[in-house]
Every structure is written in C-alpha cells, then in structure tokens.
C-alpha cells in the first residue's frame, strides 16, 4: 500500500511530461529553450540526488524525503500558474527538479530493504509497472483535458492536486524500515562468492585440473556507470524533443492535436507490458546479459525512426507510434535490470549515485536533443541517439 502515493505522483508527472514542452512553445518559447530548461534542471539535480541519497542512508530515515519531494512539487506546480515568462518558468522548474529527486533514492532503498535479493527484480518490476500505470493515466488525462479545451492554468492546478494527493497518502502509508541490512548482506555474499571461486580455481590449478576462469572476475563498476550515462544521454537526446516531433507529424497528417497525448499513452502502455513481463522473470543470472541486448535493440529502433521522413503523413504517425511502444517496453525491462544491479554494485551510503548517473546523461541529452533538432533536423537526432545507444551497449558488454 505504501506505493499508492507514488502512483498519484507519477500520474501528475505523466500529464506534465507532454504538457510542459507544448506549454513552453505556446508562451513563445523555442526548442532551444526547452532544451535549456530540461538540461539546467537536470544538472542542478545531479549533486542533490547524491545528497538526498547520502542523507537518507546516513540517518536511516526515508519517509521525510519522500514527503519533501511530493509537497515541493505541489507548491511549485501551483506557482507555475502565475507565470507566462519562459525565463521564470525555467527557474521554477529547476527548483522543482532539485527537490523532486529527493524521493528517488529513498524509494529504491525501501524496495531493496523491504524485500530479499531474490525478490528485487520482481519488486522493482511491480513498483515500476504500478507507477507506470499512473503515468499512463496521467497521459490519458492530458488527452481528455486537451480535448475538453482546458486552459494551461487549469491543467497545472490539476497536476498540483495530484501531487498533493500523493503527499497525503504517503504521509499515512509510508513507513521507514525497522532494520536496514539487506544491501549489506548482498555485498558480503558477493565478496564471499568471489573469494570461494578464487580458492576453487587456485586449488584446481595446483592439482593440475584444467578450469575455465572466464567467470572469475569482478563486476566492472566503471563500465556499468558509463553505460548508464550513455543510455540516459541517448534517451534524452531522443525523447526531449519527441513531443514536438510527434506534434509536427500529427499536424501534417491533419489529425487532432490531442492525438499527441494518445501516442505517448501507447508508449507508456508498452512500458506496462514490459514491467508485467519483468515480474515473471526470476533468473537473476541473465540480468547482465539481457541488459546489453536491450540497449542494442533500443539503438536499432532509434535508427528505424529515420524511415518516418520517407513515409506519407499517416504512415509516419503509425510507424512513430509503433516504435515508441517498443521503446516503452524495452525501457521497462532495462530499468528493472539496472535498478536491481545498482543495489548490488553501489554501496550503502551512495544510493543516490544511480540517479546522479542518469541525471548526468539526461542533462546532456536534454540540451543536445532540442539543439540538434532545431539546428539540423530530427533525422540527425535519430542518428545521434542510435549511435550513443550502441556505445552504451558496448559499455554494458564490458560490465
């Protein structure tokens, strides 16, 4: 039940994710200013992600940071309604991002500490799938509000209200774990397993027995971190300007503007399917290898978007929608895998590092994506994203 507040929080941010770029354009902003807003917000949230993770691990208190995140989102979204200045909007959004990430590390730790290691994949998959449904409903609400011609202020009030509900529910339902030890046990188990395999191989070699040493190596944490940054970079390059791209091809096809939200609803639906599948997979040993394959497929489908420019207006909308559904599916599986792996390889006290790495890549991609789209066109965006996805694939193969 403690996840219920996060459900409403994601509902609000699902609605905001598509509405905000369109709102910036509506008040006279440009693709470049969207990129600046997203990248500045992410850059400022990077050090605070690490700070929130350090503080919650140090004090063994997680609920207070979740409440801070949801309450801050409520207040700042309300303040959004008083501005039509792009510069002021960028400032408010940056402050909101700094406080918004306060719930990320505590949420990951709660899942890791409330469940045993063998259930981490299923637990992360259930959480992400459950909140993805909230995100999907938020997108549907955006479609409905757009169809009903709600103005910008009413939409922002609605987003703020959803975050207020999230705050109140979390105030009642979220509890700090009585004991925090599961991640420490996993770290000890990995060290003991590594040592026992080393002793076995050494004794076998002394006895003259031929053994394979291909599995006798520690995880390459640097490669894992590099892969996360590159994956986040490619994703942000592709998805930051994506609402504008979808809006353009929908207009070209003479379809209703509300269809933009519908396309991203289907993208989110692909994510829900991915999380449902992840809950059924229990083979922990396949997590590392499957992660690299998922990244490779993301790269291939990014290149597939190049075909959109060669098709008729209606066909381009159909292909873009299909690719976004697959992207949602692959991203869900990737996120479950990497969250579980991060709880193994990132030590306690640094639980915010996962969000820092995602933020570093996201900040760069949020700036580069709109800049490339505005300067060179969306075709270059798709090529660049595909190349960076393939570089991320190489990093995860090394890991």
Each language-model region and where it sits:
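Juxtamembrane intracellular "pre-TM" segments in multi-pass secondary transporters
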Residues: 176-225
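Intracellular juxtamembrane helix-capping segments at the cytosolic ends
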Residues: 102-115, 331-346
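Helix-loop boundary and gating motifs at the non-cytosolic
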Residues: 1-43, 220-227, 232-261
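A late C-terminal transmembrane helix in Major Facilitator Superfamily
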Residues: 347-376
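Helix-to-loop junctions at the C-terminal end of transmembrane segments
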Residues: 48-60, 274-287, 373
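Structural signature of the two symmetry-related core transmembrane helices
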Residues: 64-78, 289-305
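Central cavity-lining transmembrane alpha-helices of secondary-active solute carriers
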Residues: 36-54, 262-277
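Cytoplasmic helix-loop-helix junction between adjacent transmembrane helices
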Residues: 94-133
């Amino acid at each position: 039940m403690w996840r219920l507040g996060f459900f409403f929080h994601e509902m609000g941010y699902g609605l905001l994710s598509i509405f905000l770029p369109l709102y910036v354009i509506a008040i006279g902003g440009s693709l470049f200013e969207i990129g600046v807003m997203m990248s500045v917000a992410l850059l400022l949230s990077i050090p605070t992600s690490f700070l929130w993770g350090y503080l919650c691990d140090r004090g063994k208190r997680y609920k207070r940071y979740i409440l801070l995140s949801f309450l801050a989102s409520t207040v700042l979204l309300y303040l959004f309604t008083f501005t039509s200045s792009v510069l002021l909007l960028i400032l408010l959004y940056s402050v909101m991002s700094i406080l918004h990430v306060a719930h990320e590390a505590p949420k990951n730790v709660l899942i890791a500490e409330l469940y045993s290691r063998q259930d981490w994949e299923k637990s992360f998959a259930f959480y992400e799938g459950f909140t993805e449904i909230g995100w999907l409903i938020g997108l549907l609400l955006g479609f409905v509000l757009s169809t009903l011609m709600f103005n910008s202020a009413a939409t922002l009030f609605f987003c703020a209200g959803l975050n207020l509900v999230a705050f109140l529910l979390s105030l009642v339902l979220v509890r700090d774990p009585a004991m925090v030890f599961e991640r420490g046990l996993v770290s000890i188990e990995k060290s003991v397993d590594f040592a026992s395999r080393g002793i076995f191989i050494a004794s076998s070699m002394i006895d003259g027995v031929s053994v394979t040493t291909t599995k006798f190596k520690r995880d390459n944490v640097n490669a894992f971190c590099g892969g996360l940054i590159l994956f986040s970079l490619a994703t942000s390059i592709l998805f930051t300007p994506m609402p504008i791209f979808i809006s353009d091809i929908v207009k070209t096809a003479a379809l209703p503007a509300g269809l933009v939200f519908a396309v991203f609803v289907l993208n989110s639906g692909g994510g829900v399917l991915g999380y449902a599948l992840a809950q059924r997979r229990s083979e922990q040993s396949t997590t590392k290898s499957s992660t690299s394959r998922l990244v490779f497929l993301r790269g291939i489908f990014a290149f597939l978007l190049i075909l959109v420019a060669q098709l008729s207006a209606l066909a381009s909308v159909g292909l873009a929608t299909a690719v976004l559904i697959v992207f949602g599916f692959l991203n869900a599986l990737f996120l479950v895998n990497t969250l579980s792996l991060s709880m193994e390889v990132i030590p306690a006290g640094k639980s915010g590092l996962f969000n820092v790495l995602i933020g570093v890549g996201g900040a760069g991609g949020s700036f580069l994506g709109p800049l490339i789209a505005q300067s060179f066109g969306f075709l270059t965006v798709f090529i660049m994203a595909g190349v960076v996805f393939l570089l991320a694939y190489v990093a995860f193969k090394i890991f």
